[in-house]
A protein has these predicted regions:
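Helix-to-loop junction immediately C-terminal to a conserved catalytic motif
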Residues: 56
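ABC ATPase nucleotide-binding domain helices that frame the ATP-binding cleft
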Residues: 49-52, 148-150
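The feature captures the beta-strand-to-loop junction immediately N-terminal to the Walker
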Residues: 41-43
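Non-catalytic connector elements of ABC transporters
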Residues: 257-354
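Short beta-strand immediately N-terminal to the Walker A/P-loop
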Residues: 38-39, 85
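ABC ATPase nucleotide-binding domains
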Residues: 82, 88, 92-233
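Conserved ABC transporter NBD signature motif
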Residues: 64-72
Length: 354
């Protein structure tokens, strides 16, 4: 196991770079403590897999360093880095038994067979593969095959980190939840550094203690799931996390006042000055309520999810979604909205006012 540190990492697949768009990732700085559960979250093409492949040694970064336990390992090859990597699609040996698949990494390292037997049975029990150990791997279902891939990463006790690149892509939605829960349980048992790459917010937020959100090759926020939900530091984090995502509305800054649709609203921050090209207010649907005064809107539709109602409204400057209690009476036609001050934030050029 190891503490993983990334310092000033940037990478481009082009020989020359003339703009930010030429970089797959840029200016990445991360500290992941030994034994933690982490997630890299972002849409396709944001640089997640590039970053993962740099850590494992499959790609050499254009700039920056990778450190394990404060030692620079940028020049080491993938084998020397001692990383276990689990990919989107199960990588198994079909003609081997499940037992032999799990034992394979240990046999490559000349581990004594008795020790291999103990370790394989331990991991098989954790992953509920014990009853299939003598079966050929080709006979297993998609989730069973991915369990083998997970097991081969977990069976080694000498790895510096275990990295998962969208490991549940091919898994049925119900089985995803089961495997994700099992992975979380395994992390608590073996206490190894795990880095989970995904575009799925549910996977990231339920697995990781700390989530790194990436957007267009940059890290826009790192924090706990609660941090990311309650205080998005970038409007992208607000859009991307939450269902529905954060409402983001254009606003004007007049002195220390924040104006939305001609109405002054109170926000979490005290505004001192604004020299941004674009200013916006962000508030999640959970923190908006109907009121006798406030932002004027027109109620467009109401969807009952069973747990709550999602109300679509429209204001002068854009649509606003509200999450209301399932038994709450929703006005029809014209209405007014009030934003909860503690969770209403002002953004300048997409970044939160600090």
């Amino acid at each position: 196991m190891a503490k993983v540190t990334l310092k000033g990492l940037s990478h481009s697949y082009l020989k020359t770079q003339s703009s930010d768009a030429d970089w797959a990732i840029r200016g990445v700085d991360i500290d992941w403590n030994d034994g933690g559960a982490y997630a890299l979250l972002g849409p396709s093409g944001c640089g997640k897999t590039t970053l993962l492949n740099i850590i494992s040694g499959l790609i050499t970064p254009t700039k920056g360093d990778i450190l394990f336990d404060d030692k620079v390992i940028s020049g080491l090859n993938p084998v020397q880095r001692n990383i276990a990597q689990i990919f989107q699609f199960p990588v198994i040996y079909d003609t081997m038994t499940v037992y032999d698949n799990l034992a394979f990494p240990l046999r490559n390292r000349k581990i004594p067979e008795e020790e291999i037997k103990v370790k394989v049975h331990e991991i098989a029990e954790m992953l509920e593969l014990s009853s299939t150990l003598n079966n050929r791997a080709s006979s297993l279902t998609a989730d069973g095959k991915q369990k083998i891939s997970l097991g081969r990463g977990l069976v080694r006790s000498d790895v510096n980190a275990i990295m998962f690149d969208e490991p549940l892509t091919v898994i049925d939605p119900h089985l995803k939840w089961i495997l994700r829960s099992k992975l979380k349980e395994l992390h608590q048992k073996i206490n190894r550094t795990m880095i989970y790459v995904t575009h799925d917010q549910t996977e990231a937020l339920t697995f990781a203690d700390q989530v790194v959100v990436m957007h267009e090759g940059q890290i826009v926020q790192t924090g706990t799931p609660v941090d990311l939900f309650e205080k998005p530091k970038h409007t992208f984090v607000g859009y991307f996390i939450g269902s529905p995502g954060m409402n983001v509305l254009p606003c004007q800054i007049k002195g220390s006042d924040v104006i939305v649709n001609g109405k002054k609203i109170e926000t979490h921050q005290k505004i001192k000055k604004s020299n941004f090209d674009k200013t916006e207010v962000g508030v999640r649907p959970e923190f908006i309520s109907f009121s006798n005064e406030g932002i004027p809107v027109k109620v467009l539709s109401v969807s009952n999810t069973g747990r709550h109602k999602i109300v679509d409204t429209e204001s002068e400057t854009g649509k606003i979604k509200i999450i209301a209690k399932f038994n709450e009476d929703i006005p029809s036609g014209s209405a007014f909205l009030k934003f909860k001050k503690e969770y209403t934030y002002t953004y300048g050029d997409s970044w939160i006012f600090e």
